Amino acid sequence: MTTTTTAPALPTPIHDGLGNGTTYERSIPRPVNPFSNRVPGREIITVPNFTLESGVEMRNVPVAYMSWGKLSPKANNVMIICHALSGSADVSDWWGPLLGPGKAFDTDKFFVICMNSLGSPYGTASPVTAKNGDYSEGWYGADFPATTIRDDVRLHKLVLDRLGVRKVAAVIGGSMGGMHVLEWAFFGKDYVRCIVPAATSSHQSAWAIGWGEAQRHAIRSDVKYKNGRYGFDDPPILGLEAARMTALLTYRSRDSLERRFGRDTGNKKKAKNKGSETLPSNSTPIHSQGGADETPVAFDRADSNFAAQSYLRYQAKKFSDRFDSNCYIALTNKLDTHDLARGRTRTITEALSLIEQPTLVLGIRSDGLYTLAEQEQIARTVPNAKLREIVSDDGHDAFLIEWSQLNWLLVGFLHESLPDIMQRAAL
């Protein structure tokens, strides 16, 4: 991949203070790819060497993060927030109503931090960052190595070490972030005190793997994908938009879409009697208008007859403006590797039983991607866990929507699990 954007300012070396001679670099870089400005104010710590689970060694690995609040004198009031698939380190962008004084992510009591995952376009090493941190080598693109949820957590632990963190009070996240939460638990209760996994799984199911493959296939089918060897100036937008549409349908439920759109056409002059609807003049007796010829069909064509179609196309376009196709493939492949038992135990049940921390599992009955049954399995098997339901018919996305319920559930759990932090005065 190539770009003409400005190279970053040189970072300042900082020793980690751990006595092992490792040097990290901390900087706020200038734009180097189309996604660099999407998360204003993020900071970067560069880890000089990092070996992935696969055995691949990466050099000069940037990790983007954002933080709020103050680290306590004992460096033990850290709250880690783990982002979902398409999220960034900016918690205020996607869980903003939970962040701030007196809220679940109380910045008067906690040092709140969110670190960006490997493969994401928002600052951490990914297909849109320079190979081994060297811009003369070009961008990773399709050559970005496969990474795992466990890789992310190990890398993020190095960032916390660099920042002087001694103990983590709580780790909270949903969906892919919930997978990270569960992996953090394996650092032990002496390091991580409590966890909150939401709308997630102990291992990626065949159902979720199948949906991910359908999305990747949509991207690879775009003629502009070119086996991942595309440029920033002409990316495979249509494939990425198709993938996003598919994903959106797994994030919501049938009932939520029916309630919101029904058979609405978005036309204020539509007949009151829905039975009198007539087909538009451009209707055609095929399922996909894109299959009529070899000409790519843009998703912003004004041939949407139903509001549900317009919604999907609008959301897909918004997404393609802020995300990268190779990053999407890297992240969805990462999800498929998720398995708490891998390399630890023979079964998922045995792996879950090793988690010692107080655990609040949050599930959504209408979630068709990471089902309530999967949350029940986690809560039933983790020794010190309890399950609470987010009541919503909005499907998987309810963990990002039902802020009032989330805040109430989280604050109650944190008071119960961390009374020393929750009851003390603001820092």
UniProtKB/Swiss-Prot annotation:
Residues annotated as catalytic: 175, 367, 396
Biotechnology comment: Fusaric acid is phytotoxic to plants such as cotton and banana. It has been shown to induce programmed cell death in plants. In addition to a mild toxicity to animals, fusaric acid exhibits acanthamoebicidal, antioomycete, and antimycobacterial activities.
Name recorded for this polypeptide: Homoserine O-acetyltransferase FUB5
Ranges of residues in domain AB hydrolase-1: 77-400
Pfam families for the chain: Abhydrolase_1 (PF00561)
InterPro entries given in the database record: AB_hydrolase_1 (IPR000073), AB_hydrolase_fold (IPR029058), HAT_MetX-like (IPR008220)
Function: Homoserine O-acetyltransferase; part of the gene cluster that mediates the biosynthesis of fusaric acid, a mycotoxin with low to moderate toxicity to animals and humans, but with high phytotoxic properties. L-aspartate is suggested as fusaric acid amino acid precursor that is activated and further processed to O-acetyl-L-homoserine by cluster enzymes aspartate kinase FUB3 and homoserine O-acetyltransferase FUB5, as well as enzymes of the primary metabolism.
Bias (Low complexity): 1-13
Name of the top EC class for this enzyme: transferase
Lineage: Eukaryota, Fungi, Dikarya, Ascomycota, Pezizomycotina
